[in-house]
């Protein structure tokens, strides 16, 4: 919850961060994207390290790094310092999350008991994603944006003091003795280059040499990643598993879901504070209905999954999310319509949670016990890469519309609307993906994926 919460608790503080540290243009989104990139890029590597060296050990080490990076980020005096601290935070989170998830799956037996535990895990992730906006607003208003990072330190210290007592060590004696560092490096750097190309294209030009060369470099690095994984004795991400239809489609849906959630929160933060002029506290409180929708929808999603199956439940969630985002985009205005915007937010968030819980269950539901750690790592990696892509893409859309428009308030509102239209389109694509390709994949009523 702490690692997921930190993704969004910083989002509400972005306008304050931008003003105080002097971020220019679309650079401020790297405060979010940098965290997600290092987090997502190292998840599988850290998961493998946990199997090899001990999950409790990785959990403790990751939490310690996370706390130290939070302290450093809170003391940041320049944009690059904050981005660097967020990158380091992502490293800590990458060690923390797969270790906690592996400890969870090792604790609970298979079947319904494990499904319930995974459902709670998915629900906590979704609730943390929304709750961070509220807490971020309160903290930024009364204590300043630096405290959205400082607050992690006492929480981490408390958990670190209890971990040796309440958490039993767990590791896989069959885990490989080598770590695929080349795979982790090429995947992370490749995606970083692609995201940089997209995020900076509105300023450099979509066909500028910088954009083209950066995108080409990212493509080459991702191609090298595939080659490395095919030849590695102990690959970071075994391609035969990722090539299974069920695993591939589910994680593709997770990426799209995360893009939608990240884009929505980014746009609404700018709308409330930059377009409407609300304070961080007021903006944070406007996310309370959305958070309430998460809390209510989480158990409902579990019930629907038991009744309808994962695919049908997730598909309904994406349909509801798309409808809610269309509602919000249609009502954005600097002169009113706030109630309609809030209602659309509630609808979109309810749909998000209804999609999130079954996808979390499905992502680890059809692999063997010896593959659950990998499947959990792939799920978390897909989530973080989706977040990074969502922030970069929506920032690029907003910037492109603003650059092509007359400027001022109308250009900002137009960019925000297009950002939400883009998020709604991504949700619709996820819906189509599930309908067309999952077939019996995650449609099993009380089971996970069945890859043809």
Where are these regions (language model features)?
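Short helix-kink/termination motifs in transmembrane helices of multi-pass secondary transporters
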Residues: 2-13, 38-41, 55, 148, ...
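Interfacial helix-cap and linker-helix signal at transmembrane-aqueous boundaries
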Residues: 17-18, 49-50, 135-143, 198, ...
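Transmembrane-helix bundle of Major Facilitator Superfamily
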Residues: 1-165, 300, 308, 319, ...
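12-transmembrane solute porter fold
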Residues: 1-12, 31, 209-221, 234-404, ...
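Cytoplasmic-side transmembrane-helix entry/capping segments in multi-pass membrane proteins
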Residues: 61, 113-125, 176-186, 211, ...
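Hydrophobic transmembrane-helix bundles of small-molecule transporters
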Residues: 119, 141-254, 260, 278, ...
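Transmembrane alpha-helical core positions of polytopic small-molecule transporters
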Residues: 61, 94, 129, 187, ...
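A residue-level signal for alpha-helical anchor/packing sites in multi-pass solute transporters
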Residues: 103, 107, 138, 162, ...
């Amino acid at each position: 919850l702490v690692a997921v919460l930190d993704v969004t608790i910083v989002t509400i503080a972005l306008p304050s961060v931008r003003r105080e540290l002097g971020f220019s243009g679309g650079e401020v989104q790297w405060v979010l994207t940098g965290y997600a990139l290092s987090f997502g890029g190292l998840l599988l590597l850290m998961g493998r390290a946990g199997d090899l060296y001990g999950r409790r050990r990785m959990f403790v080490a990751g939490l310690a790094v996370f706390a130290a990076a939070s302290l450093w980020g809170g003391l940041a005096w320049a944009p690059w310092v904050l981005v660097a601290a967020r990158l380091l935070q992502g490293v800590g989170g990458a060690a923390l999350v797969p270790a906690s998830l592996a400890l969870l799956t090792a604790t609970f037996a298979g079947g319904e008991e494990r499904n319930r535990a995974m459902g709670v895990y998915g629900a906590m992730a979704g609730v943390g994603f929304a709750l961070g906006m509220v807490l971020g607003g309160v903290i930024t208003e009364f204590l300043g944006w630096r405290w959205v990072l400082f607050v992690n330190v006492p929480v981490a210290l408390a958990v670190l003091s209890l971990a040796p007592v309440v958490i039993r060590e767990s590791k896989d004696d069959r885990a490989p003795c080598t770590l695929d560092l080349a795979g982790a490096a090429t995947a992370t750097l490749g995606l970083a280059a692609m995201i940089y190309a997209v995020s900076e294209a509105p300023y450099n030009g979509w066909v500028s040499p910088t954009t083209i060369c950066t995108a080409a470099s990212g493509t080459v690095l991702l191609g090298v990643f595939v080659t490395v994984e095919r030849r590695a004795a102990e690959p970071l991400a075994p391609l035969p598993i990722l090539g299974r239809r069920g695993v591939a489609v589910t994680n593709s849906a997770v990426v799209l879901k995360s893009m939608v959630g990240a884009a929505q929160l980014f746009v609404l933060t700018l709308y409330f504070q930059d377009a409407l002029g609300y304070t961080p506290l007021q903006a944070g409180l406007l996310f309370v209905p959305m958070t309430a929708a998460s809390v209510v929808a989480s158990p409902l999603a579990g019930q629907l999954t038991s009744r309808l199956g994962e695919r049908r439940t997730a598909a309904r969630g994406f349909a509801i999310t798309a409808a809610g985002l269309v509602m919000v985009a249609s009502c954005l205005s600097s002169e009113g319509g706030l109630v309609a915007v809030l209602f659309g937010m509630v609808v979109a968030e309810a749909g998000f949670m209804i999609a999130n819980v079954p996808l979390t269950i499905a992502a680890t539901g059809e692999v063997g016990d010896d593959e659950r750690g990998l499947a959990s790592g792939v799920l978390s990696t897909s989530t973080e890469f989706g977040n990074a892509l969502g922030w970069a893409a929506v920032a690029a859309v907003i910037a492109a519309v603003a650059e092509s428009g007359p400027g001022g308030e109308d250009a900002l509102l137009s960019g925000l609307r297009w950002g939400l239209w883009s998020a709604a389109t991504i949700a619709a694509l996820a819906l189509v993906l599930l309908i067309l390709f999952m077939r019996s994949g995650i449609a099993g009523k009380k089971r996970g994926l069945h890859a043809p």
